[in-house]
A protein has these predicted regions:
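Acidic/glycine-rich C-terminal interaction modules and beta/coil loop segments
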Residues: 1-89
Length: 89
């Protein structure tokens, strides 16, 4: 998958290629995941929110210009954990 946009900079840049481990969908431990947020596929850092009812995650962009937000497990679909990326030099 190609990354689109600058919300995950400086970690991931626009047009980086990411390899997704679709067998790793649990946001524990925290990490960078590809998820479907109802509008499309996005790469974001996810953190499980302990003791949340219903279960929820904090969705975080590495770029500080984009604020973090929270979503319940029903509001997103985690595709998998990003394990590798490549960038053209």
């Amino acid at each position: 998958m190609h990354v689109e946009g600058d919300s995950m900079m400086p970690t991931l840049h626009n047009d980086d290629i990411v390899l997704i481990d679709v067998g790793r969908r649990s946001p524990t431990p925290p990490g960078i995941f590809v998820l479907h947020d109802g509008m499309g596929l996005v790469a974001k850092r996810l953190e499980h929110i302990p003791n949340s009812d219903p279960p929820a995650v904090r969705v975080i962009s590495d770029n500080p210009l984009y604020p973090a937000y929270e979503r319940t497990a029903d509001e997103i679909r985690i595709i998998g954990r990003i394990r590798w990326f490549a960038r053209e030099i």
